[in-house]
Amino acid sequence: MKIKTRFAPSPTGYLHVGGARTALYSWLFARHLGGEFLLRIEDTDLERSTQPAIDAIMDGMNWLNLDWDEGPYFQTKRFDRYNAVIDDMLSKGTAYHCYCSKERLETLREAQMARGEKPRYDGRCRDSHEHHADDEPCVVRFRNPQDGSVVFNDLIRGPIEFSNQELDDLIIRRIDGSPTYNFCVVVDDFDMAITHVIRGEDHINNTPRQINILKALGAPVPAYAHVSMILGDDGKKLSKRHGAVGVMQYRDDGFLPEALLNYLVRLGWSHGDQEIFSVDEMKQLFSFEAVSKSASAFNTEKLLWLNHHYINHLPADYVATHLVLHIEQQGIDTRTGPQLAALVKLLGERCKTLKEIAASCRYFYEDFSEFDADAAKKHLRPVAVLALEAVRANLAALSEWTPATVHAAIEQTAEALQVGMGKVGMPLRVAVTGTGQSPALDVTVHAIGQSRCLARIVKALDFIACRTQESAG
């Protein structure tokens, strides 16, 4: 049997982390077993479905590199197929017209709730022989079995059973003629030969209804796996109030797709105590036997830790391709400084996101108009003039400009002045970067470049002289 899974989001909002994890699990299961993975857009909610949401889903899938073998399919383009199946069910008696008014159904619901009963349709039209005009408004309901039970073996949770007496006759076609979500899903899974349905646990209650419809159609019943929800740090379902965002927001915040994938796969699945997984390892190792039934808590610090790991362990040239977006957002022209791959190596250890790298790299490419006030107050003082003049002379004398020769020049200056390296290094760092923090000074000075560093030291000396004059005045 060829394994075939699907990811079937509704385009009513962005692709959130819960949906992305479901997509990842479905994709990994298919790839692990050499099967196929398809993308289906379940856009039957015409009022809430939007093109921007469809675009966000596609962008998120592409950014995460979750490629699909078929699709994307759109349910709104299959309405003729759904209605043809419904008409066939009506002719076979597995579905029926229901003419009950909204008012009657609301009265029925209120009475059932007043008696402490679960609200459900009472089947009034199920076996009715009343005559109705062809144009009388009605819905179509599925004739659900009234006895027995539905049992399915969830790949994560084990056997789950529902009594058919608990299931009412589901509406499968609305009064406006449009098919309903639960019905469209069944026809799609049948037509598209889906063998494994992997989705969130909020769909468990839909499963027995869908299985009964499949059986009524004479269709094979797929296997099901219902993934537990993701919680916020307060133990409640992850939502916008926890800062939950769409997948593409993680890109915009400077995360690598490898980091988010690694984080999402571990958000419910494990392989021993291993934390770092390449995509190839995920495909090789993934199985539902190792997926937890319990809800998982989203931990941003863990995601940041993984992102820092991937920034520093993936090839710098590759990381640089993802850094471009953030550099452009900062408006930095990188033609007059180190290559972006070199920048990744320079700042990667100090930064947890690509956005942080872009925000802290400007001094490598552009001259700054002001020094950081605290750093200048502490290190650009008259006592630093001698060190800055001496180190400038030694740097200017270098015929070979490498981190090693830069380091030797700084060390030579400190030895000549009989002071510690910090007495030379800190004023020099503030002079050439404008701040009190940077990567190792020798590689920083080297990356900024000889002529630019020499000019910035002069600027720092002028700054000290100006401040000294102001103080004296």
Swiss-Prot record:
Amino acids binding Zn(2+): C98, C100, C125, D127
Taxonomic lineage: Bacteria, Pseudomonadati, Pseudomonadota, Gammaproteobacteria, Enterobacterales
Named cofactor requirement(s): Zn(2+)
Subcellular location: Cytoplasm
Chain span(s) of sequence motif 'KMSKS' region: 237-241
Family named by the database record: Belongs to the class-I aminoacyl-tRNA synthetase family. Glutamate--tRNA ligase type 1 subfamily.
UniProt cross-references to Pfam families, sorted A to Z: Anticodon_2 (PF19269), tRNA-synt_1c (PF00749)
GO biological process: glutamyl-tRNA aminoacylation
Sequence motif: 'HIGH' region, positions: 9-19
Entries under HAMAP family matching the protein: Glu_tRNA_synth_type1
Name of the protein in its database record: Glutamate--tRNA ligase
Quaternary organization: Monomer.
Highest taxon of the lineage: Bacteria
Organism: Sodalis glossinidius (strain morsitans)
Enzyme type, top EC level: ligase
EC nos: 6.1.1.17
Keyword Nucleotide-binding: yes
Gene Ontology CC terms: cytosol
